Regions:
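Mature extracytoplasmic or organellar-lumen-exposed domains after removal of signal/transit peptides
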Residues: 36-275
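General helical secondary-structure elements
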Residues: 7-8, 64
Length: 275
């Protein structure tokens, strides 16, 4: 989730955008409960698709990206659950269900409730159905990892090795697999998708044009959704620009409920208030 910002001028009255990185950014103090949707908040934004006759009123949509952040967080948590080999097969299978996707409605392993920091969603399908990390991983060869593997293959290999360790750490190599899996996924999935897909070829005028819906029946235009998808991979809460750097950090660590709870309902909505 991200911590860099590049100035841009784009649709939703948002004045700056993070460069798809790694750390999570978030939300603002009690005053924001009443002024949560200011000019520095990412949405809501009205539907502008010509001829749209559905019931949707907000064109902002990036729930698939939020689901993948949750898959990443849950996978990182699972990577530390090995007992030294005894549970390796079961743990690997469970980790692969979060990496490769599952037909089951998987529980959110992280983030979860922490003190008065109450998370609204408890299962992945409450955010978005049918999402995975494997299908969005970098498809080229990763030269910096042995074996000439693709991004998805590297992550699958890391998962296999993590499952065989005790607590995710391999004392022979010094590899900390929760950290390796997390940091590699941030680059091979989130950064790669945002920078080398949505903010690259999909910004071409003839690719997902803004004069048409993103796909048939969609309530957002091509370029609206391209930008939303990139923002979603950045991993910031919708009102993160209203926060100081300290508040962003505190929310990422689940230590500042007031800053996180933009609408003041006492719950943290992973779709907009935290990722």
């Amino acid at each position: 989730m991200a911590n860099e910002e590049d100035d841009v001028d784009m649709k939703k009255s948002i004045n700056s955008f993070g460069a798809a990185g790694a750390v999570i950014a978030f939300l603002s103090p009690l005053a924001l409960a009443s002024a949560a949707y200011s000019d520095a908040t990412y949405g809501p934004f009205p539907v502008t698709v010509k001829g749209y006759s559905g019931s949707k009123t907000n064109s902002v949509s990036y729930t698939g990206q939020i689901a993948r952040h949750v898959l990443h967080d849950s996978l990182k948590k699972l990577a530390s659950k090995g007992d030294g080999g005894g549970n390796a097969a079961n743990l690997q299978a469970e980790m692969m269900a979060y990496f490769g996707g599952s037909d089951n409605n998987k529980a959110i392993i992280a983030p979860v409730d922490k003190g008065d920091f109450n998370i609204k969603q408890e299962t992945l399908n409450e955010i978005s159905k049918g999402k995975n990390l494997s299908g969005k991983s970098y498809k080229g060869v990763v030269n910096g990892w042995p074996g000439q593997m693709t991004g998805a293959e590297v992550l699958a290999s890391m998962i296999e090795h993590a499952a065989a360790t005790k607590g995710g750490f391999d004392p022979v190599t010094g590899y900390n697999y929760p950290q390796l899996i997390s940091k590699f996924a941030m680059g091979a999935v989130f950064y790669n998708q945002a920078v080398d897909n949505y903010l690259d070829e999909k910004l071409a005028a003839d690719n997902k044009p803004n004069s048409k819906p993103y796909k048939d029946g969609a309530h957002y235009t091509g370029k609206e959704h391209v930008w939303d998808e990139a923002f979603g991979y950045w991993g910031a809460a919708a009102h993160s620009l209203n926060l100081s750097a300290k508040e962003n950090y505190e929310v990422a660590k689940m230590k500042n409920l007031t800053a996180a709870d933009a609408n003041g309902d006492g719950m943290i909505d992973l779709k907009s208030e935290m990722t």
